[in-house]
Amino acid sequence: MSMQDPIADMLTRIRNGQAANKVGVTMPSSKLKVAIAEVLKEEGFINSFTVEGDITNPTLVIILKYYQGKPVVERIDRISCPSLRIYKKRDALPKVMGGMGIAIISTSKGVITDRAARQAGLGGEVICYVA
């Protein structure tokens, strides 16, 4: 049986891994998942990530981050789903928790945060919120 929403699966694995105090989580890899992991690493929500395995079956390994024994990611929510895509113009990009969190946006220039999209004057698909 095929997976309906691989990005929601990725976010759920991160959420469940941190709830269970796991060191890391593994999942099937894709270009979009690697781009999301890169944004999470740049923003300090995960320690690191690697892509392992061969070209035909790559696996994404994400090393989770904790601060004083508590998960750094308090909330991670999928916004745009395959059945209901959510697009925002540059003027309507959301602020997560009053600027304390980030929204990950897929734009024509790649996957970036809401802050970077505002600075570049780009809109796009709102993939998820992370706080």
Swiss-Prot record:
GO terms for molecular function: rRNA binding; structural constituent of ribosome. The keyword RNA-binding applies. One of the primary rRNA binding proteins, it binds directly to 16S rRNA central domain where it helps coordinate assembly of the platform of the 30S subunit. This is Small ribosomal subunit protein uS8. It comes from Hamiltonella defensa subsp. Acyrthosiphon pisum (strain 5AT). Signal peptide: none annotated. InterPro entries: Ribosomal_uS8, Ribosomal_uS8_CS, Ribosomal_uS8_sf. Belongs to the universal ribosomal protein uS8 family. It comes from the Bacteria. Disulfide bonds: none annotated. GO terms for cellular component: ribonucleoprotein complex; ribosome.
